[in-house]
A protein has these predicted regions:
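Extracytoplasmic/secreted proteins, especially bacterial periplasmic and envelope-associated proteins
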Residues: 2-5, 9, 49-53, 117-120, ...
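Active-site-proximal substrate-binding groove within the catalytic cores of carbohydrate-active enzymes
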Residues: 1, 71, 78, 85-105, ...
Length: 505
């Protein structure tokens, strides 16, 4: 349920953008424990009850949840582990897999499929979580730990077992399971695997399916070729809950508004035209043909056009992108490089030049368009400063708009900005998110630490929550401080104690 508080924190910081949350360690004792007992939801982290609370309450904030499973290797503590389904070579030797907890042993995937045992284990999980679960991420599938050939036939069968329970399919390798997978870890986690593991770079595939999945080569210029500022962007996976030691919250938010908001905005439209440029040398890729202009439309006929600034990778304008929606500019400039390090982000180095004012007209829970009064605009200015924008239709007749700076406590620092001739002029701090509304708007309603024994266990609610939920004794000082990675903590100084009564024990 700590993850539920993190969902709420991100919801406040993004004013309710959708979230996709992968629960790496939902089973048994945590990550990779007791594979492949899919229904063994970890008791010490709350079991099925808390997991369902996380998913049902998180959905109210636009979050969808998936789990990490394995169908190619298993661990001796698993109930599914037995002599009949271990993978052996022709000499009877075990085929070993990953080794960082207990030694993983290959799970004979042909046996698991033919006997129906794997499908039964997924069905057992479905009885516990139903469609509260959104997707299943199948780790390592395709490296032939479970069979001599994890071929397309086997893969489609595995996908159908997962899809039949109402769950999306996701995989690890960048090119895995093109037909069914909607997310590939190594495509999106850009530091994984090197340039040849960065997802699917077929123009035909992306033309047809860009709006359907996160499987594409994203912006990571040091890889060259398709990774040098793709016009369509690409999901750049960062996080702050500890995977690979990543725990910097502010870096996560900066990355999200630098790369992922624009990528997800574009994915609301379908590609109808793709214009290529002339062949160039782009990093390690020779005779690379960059996309120069891409046109997209939605079901209502709204037209989005993306244009590259130059055909020459040695020209700074190669990274510059202009987006127009129905003829009005909604984004311009060069996004900060996707291979920028966390230290670069933390210290404000190597910033790009992109700024945007993107209309956001979709409900994060349902995906449907919101009422006109609930439409909003996200503003981001990488360098900071003042920019002037043409407002979209439905906004031009307003007298003024309300502008809010977004933080992990929600909308702050309300400003009223006049609308002149259908335009608005915005002043922004560098790499700081803002939301523009048609009128005054309150914050998302949040109750911290639902289902837990302490209210606001992570001190996410700021000073007001501290004062409301903790009793102070003594003359010292209690305050909320941020760690070096921007995660809130209680800081006590002087003669003081803070107490809160535990509940529901």
């Amino acid at each position: 349920l700590t993850s539920l508080d993190n969902v709420k924190r991100v919801a406040l910081n993004t004013d309710g953008l959708g979230q996709s949350v992968l629960l790496k360690g939902y089973a048994n004792e945590g990550h990779d424990s007791a594979h492949p007992d899919y229904a063994d939801i970890g008791k010490r982290i709350g079991g099925a009850d808390d997991m369902n609370t996380l998913m049902t309450e998180g959905a109210k904030y636009g979050a969808r949840f998936g789990i990490h499973v394995n169908a190619g290797e298993m661990y001796p503590e698993a109930k599914a582990f037995k002599d009949d389904n271990v993978r052996r070579d022709y000499n009877g030797n075990l085929r070993y897999g990953w080794n960082w907890l207990d030694q993983a042993v290959g799970l004979d995937s042909i046996y698991d499929l033919a006997t129906g045992e794997r499908e039964t284990r997924f069905d057992d999980l479905e009885k516990l979580v139903g469609t509260n679960l959104d997707f299943v991420y199948v780790d390592i599938w395709g490296n032939n730990t479970g069979s001599n050939d994890d071929d397309s036939w086997q893969t489609r069968k595995l996908s159908k077992e997962i899809n039949s329970n109402g769950w999306r399919m996701a995989n690890e390798w960048g090119v895995a399971n093109e037909y069914d997978a909607t997310f590939q870890h190594w495509a999106a986690d850009l530091t994984y695997g090197g340039a040849n593991q960065k997802g699917q770079n077929s123009e035909v595939m992306r033309f047809l399916r860009n709006h359907q999945k996160d499987s594409w080569v994203a912006d990571y210029p040091s890889y060259g070729g398709a990774a040098m500022m793709p016009l369509l962007g690409g999901y750049n996976m960062k996080d702050f809950e500890g995977w690979q030691g990543r725990n910097d919250y502010d870096t996560y938010i900066t990355n999200l508004f630098t790369h992922d908001v624009t990528t997800k905005f574009i994915q609301h439209y379908e590609i109808i035209k793709w214009v290529d440029g002339d062949p160039v040398s782009a990093g390690a890729a020779t005779n690379w043909i960059p996309e120069m202009e891409i046109t997209l439309k939605d079901d209502d006929g709204n037209k989005l056009v993306l244009t590259r600034g130059s055909n020459n990778p040695d020209d700074d304008a190669y990274r510059e992108r202009t987006m127009t929606l129905n003829g009005k500019i909604v984004a311009k400039g060069a996004p900060s490089r996707g291979d920028r390090t966390d230290a670069d982000i933390q210290n404000g180095r190597k910033r790009g030049t992109e700024s945007y004012l993107l209309p956001w007209i979709w409900d994060s829970e349902t995906g449907k368009k919101v009422a006109a009064d609930d439409e909003k605009l996200y503003h981001w200015n990488t360098q900071g400063g003042t920019t002037t924008w043409d407002l979209p239709e439905g906004w031009t007749n307003l007298k003024d708009v309300k502008v809010y700076k977004l933080t992990d406590l929600g909308k702050t620092e309300e400003k009223t900005v006049e609308v002149k001739n259908g335009q608005v002029t915005l002043e922004a701090e560098a790499e700081t998110p803002y939301v523009v509304c048609k009128g005054e708007e309150g914050n998302i309603n949040v109750t911290w630490s639902e289902g837990m024994h302490i209210t606001d266990a992570g001190f996410n609610g700021g000073v007001k929550s501290l004062e409301a939920n903790w009793t102070k004794a003594g003359d010292g000082n209690a305050e909320i401080a941020k760690s070096q990675y921007s995660n809130p903590m209680l800081k006590l100084s002087g003669d003081i104690s803070m107490t809160q009564e535990l509940t529901n024990l």
